[in-house]
Amino acid sequence: MKLAESMYAGPAHIGTLRVASSFRNVHAIMHAPLGDDYFNVMRSMLERERDFTPVTASIVDRHVLARGSQEKVVENIQRKDKEESPDLILLTPTCTSSILQEDLQNFVNRASETSTSDVLLADVNHYRVNELQAADRTLEQIVRFYIEKTRAKDPGSPDPGGAGRRQASSSTESGTEENLKGACGGEKTKKPSANILGMFTLGFHNQHDCRELKRLLAELDIEVNEVIPEGGLVSNLKNLPKAWFNIVPYREVGLMTAVYLEKEFGMPYTSTTPMGIIQTSAFIREMALMCHEVYNNSSTKCSQTDFESCLISNTKKVPKTYINKQTHFVSQAGWFARSIDCQNLTGQKTVVFGDATHAASMTKILVREMGIHVVCAGTYCKHDADWFREQVSGFCDQVLITDDHSQIGDIISQIEPAAIFGTQMERHIGK
C-alpha cells in the first residue's frame, strides 16, 4: 500500500464492486471502515443512472473491533435479502478491513442458511491485486459459481468440462460432439452467436464499444447470446456455453472468464480488440475461423439458409468482401488520415499511455494507419507488461511500464510531444 495523490487503477474492492453493480439485481456488501465507502458517491457522480448504486457498507467501527464483525455482517446480509430480494449478495472486504483477519467465508456460510438469495464472498487478495485484476477475478468467480450451481441441480446432464478435457487428449467424434453441447445439457444456438465478456460500469466508453460490436455482429449475421456483466442477470449465466464463441474486447476484464469457459466447454474466444482498420480486419477473420470450426464439429447443423447467409459459409470470401466494403465505402478512417487535423501530426512526436488494451491498440493505429511517430508507449497495467511489450515492439522508440504518474510526467517533459494520447492524468500533465 502507498499514499498517492492520484491512481490509475484503484484498490481491489473497487474492481469487485464495479462488477457487482454492473449486473442487474445483484447487491454488494462492503465490509469496510469509514473512508473506504466512497464507491457509491463516485459511481453515482460518473454514471448518473436512475437507480441507486446497489452497494451497502457494513462499517467497521469501535463496536466491531471490540466484539467482532460476524453479528453485524450477517445481519446486514439478512436485511438486504429481505429488503431488496437480490439474486446474489456479494460480500467483499477492503484492504483496511482485511487487516482484522476475520473468517468472512464463515459469515457467508452462516448467512446463506437463512437467506433466499445466493451469498458469495469475493475471493480476492486485496494486497496483491489492483482494481482491474480484482474485477477480472470476480467476474470469473461469479460465472463459475452459477455454472457449477446449475450442474449441481441437474447431475444427470452431460459434463461438458469432462468432454472438453477428453477432447484435449482424444480427437474422437463422440468427444467432440459432447464438447459442443451447451451449458448443463443445452445445445449450441442454431445460428452463429457470441458472448461479449467484460462490458461493465465505469469502463472507458464501454457502452459505445458494445453498441458498435453489436452492430458489427449483426452485419455479419452473428447473434449476441449474452453481454456480461453490464445489464446482465446472473440467472442467465448458465446460457453462456450456448454461444459458438466468446469475445473479450478488453484484456483487463473478461479474459479469465473466457479461459475458464474454454477449459470447461471447449469454447473458443478472441481477445483481439477491433480498434483501427487492421485490427478490426483481424478480428473479423478470427470470428470467421471460429465459426467455421464450431460448425464443422457441431452435431447440430444450422439450416442451409442460415449457413449461406452468415460468415461461416466461406471463411475467406465473405470476410474479405465485408472488410473491403467497409474500408473503401463506409469507414471514414482513410478520409481522416488525409485530413488537415491528422496531416499536422504526420511525422510529429507523440506519447501514448493508458491501460494495456487501449494503449497498445492506439499505438498501432497511429503508426500503421496515420503515419505518426510514437516516441513512448506505456501502460499502468504492470501485471500485463510482457504482453504489452510484445504488442508495441517495433512501433515505438521507448516502452514505459509504471503506475506512477510522476514518471510519465517526466517523460512527457523531456520529449515535449506534439500530442499526448492518454488518461485524464496525462491531460493535466499536458496542460
From Swiss-Prot:
<keyword id="KW-0602">Photosynthesis</keyword>
<dbReference type="GO" id="GO:0046872">
    <property type="term" value="F:metal ion binding"/>
</dbReference>
<dbReference type="GO" id="GO:0036068">
    <property type="term" value="P:light-independent chlorophyll biosynthetic process"/>
</dbReference>
<dbReference type="InterPro" id="IPR005969">
    <property type="entry name" value="Protochl_reductB"/>
</dbReference>
<feature type="active site" description="Proton donor">
    <location>
        <position position="341"/>
    </location>
</feature>
<dbReference type="GO" id="GO:0016730">
    <property type="term" value="F:oxidoreductase activity, acting on iron-sulfur proteins as donors"/>
</dbReference>
<keyword id="KW-0411">Iron-sulfur</keyword>
<protein>
    <recommendedName>
        <fullName>Light-independent protochlorophyllide reductase subunit B</fullName>
        <ecNumber>1.3.7.7</ecNumber>
    </recommendedName>
</protein>
<keyword id="KW-0067">ATP-binding</keyword>
<dbReference type="InterPro" id="IPR050152">
    <property type="entry name" value="ChlB/BchB/BchZ"/>
</dbReference>
<keyword id="KW-0150">Chloroplast</keyword>
<dbReference type="GO" id="GO:0019685">
    <property type="term" value="P:photosynthesis, dark reaction"/>
</dbReference>
<keyword id="KW-0149">Chlorophyll biosynthesis</keyword>
<feature type="region of interest" description="Disordered">
    <location>
        <begin position="150"/>
        <end position="187"/>
    </location>
</feature>
<dbReference type="GO" id="GO:0009507">
    <property type="term" value="C:chloroplast"/>
</dbReference>
<keyword id="KW-0934">Plastid</keyword>
<keyword id="KW-0004">4Fe-4S</keyword>
<comment type="pathway">
    <text>Porphyrin-containing compound metabolism; chlorophyll biosynthesis (light-independent).</text>
</comment>
<keyword id="KW-0479">Metal-binding</keyword>
<comment type="function">
    <text>Component of the dark-operative protochlorophyllide reductase (DPOR) that uses Mg-ATP and reduced ferredoxin to reduce ring D of protochlorophyllide (Pchlide) to form chlorophyllide a (Chlide). This reaction is light-independent. The NB-protein (ChlN-ChlB) is the catalytic component of the complex.</text>
</comment>
<comment type="similarity">
    <text>Belongs to the ChlB/BchB/BchZ family.</text>
</comment>
<feature type="binding site">
    <location>
        <position position="36"/>
    </location>
    <ligand>
        <name>[4Fe-4S] cluster</name>
    </ligand>
</feature>
<comment type="subunit">
    <text>Protochlorophyllide reductase is composed of three subunits; ChlL, ChlN and ChlB. Forms a heterotetramer of two ChlB and two ChlN subunits.</text>
</comment>
<dbReference type="InterPro" id="IPR000510">
    <property type="entry name" value="Nase/OxRdtase_comp1"/>
</dbReference>
<dbReference type="GO" id="GO:0005524">
    <property type="term" value="F:ATP binding"/>
</dbReference>
<keyword id="KW-0560">Oxidoreductase</keyword>
<keyword id="KW-0547">Nucleotide-binding</keyword>
<dbReference type="GO" id="GO:0051539">
    <property type="term" value="F:4 iron, 4 sulfur cluster binding"/>
</dbReference>
<keyword id="KW-0408">Iron</keyword>
<dbReference type="Pfam" id="PF00148">
    <property type="entry name" value="Oxidored_nitro"/>
</dbReference>
